[in-house]
Design a protein with these regions (language model features):
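Acidic/His-leaning functional-site neighborhoods
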Residues: 135-212
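Catalytic strand-loop segment that frames the active site of acyl-thioester-processing enzymes
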Residues: 1-22, 98-159, 173
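A short linear-motif detector with a strong N-terminal bias
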Residues: 24-29, 40-44, 58-60, 109-111, ...
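Homeobox/homeodomain signature
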Residues: 37, 88, 123, 131, ...
């Protein structure tokens, strides 16, 4: 993994961490308001982010974010989530998501709202980039993001892709992989289940600035993050 800069200022780190969590959650809440695509899965996500804190940052979640279908097919749609036109001068960050209809429909009985989660479960050390996401963490994320997708419920539930992506982005920022304004492409390659251990590693290809999340047991690729 290429480390291009390092920040040891804990106050700055906490500010950026908090900012990113809130910002991504705002995008994801906006996506959850899109109707008629329950059970569809994320194929790719393109993010345009500014990692530097801004004046009036706590106002961000009050910015009107609108999901707009920009390309539609029978089995896939592309959705853009960005600030309303009148807010774009102040807020130019955004996200595009490719949603894919699964080959088989998922029918899961509705469940009541679930309790608040504990902190992220991380096994291993910061050095080996090991992560594991508990079921309680998944349940809290679903509540906060207003995510009612049935594929994330029940005994056979898979983790929300954005939950996994968010944790990876925070870890990569701490390691100095991203700075300033950044455009990223995230590809969701395989589903991940609660408590399954994964780790971050680079692509292993010279000149390719990409990071992969792989399962510890089988080395299966779960997602890739590439700087555009």
């Amino acid at each position: 993994m290429r480390v291009r800069f390092t920040i040891y200022n804990e106050e700055v780190e906490n500010t950026v961490n908090d900012r990113l969590k809130k910002k991504l959650l705002c995008f994801e809440r906006a996506l959850s308001t899109l109707e008629g695509y329950e059970g569809w899965m994320i194929g790719t996500t393109t993010l345009h982010l500014d990692w530097q804190p801004k004046q009036g940052e706590n106002e961000f979640c009050h910015t009107k974010l609108t999901p707009e279908i920009i390309k539609k097919g029978r089995s896939a749609i592309r959705v853009r989530i960005a600030a309303a036109e009148e807010e774009k001068e102040r807020e130019n960050e955004g996200m595009e998501v490719l949603l894919v209809k699964p080959l088989q429909s998922v029918l899961v009985p509705e469940k009541e709202k679930m309790p608040l989660m504990k902190a992220i479960t991380e096994r291993g050390s910061e050095d080996d980039d090991t992560l594991a996401f508990s079921r309680s963490q998944m349940e809290e994320y679903l509540r906060e993001a207003a995510d009612t997708n049935p594929i994330h419920q029940g005994e056979a539930a898979v983790l929300p892709g954005f939950l996994v992506m968010n944790a990876c982005l925070l870890r990569l920022w701490k390691k100095g992989w991203m700075k300033g304004q950044t455009a990223l492409e995230v590809r969701f390659l395989a589903p991940l289940r609660p408590d399954e251990e994964v780790y971050l590693s680079d692509s292993g290809q010279e000149g390719r600035n990409a990071v992969y999340l792989r399962t510890k047991q089988e080395g299966k690729e779960i997602l890739s993050i590439t700087e555009k």
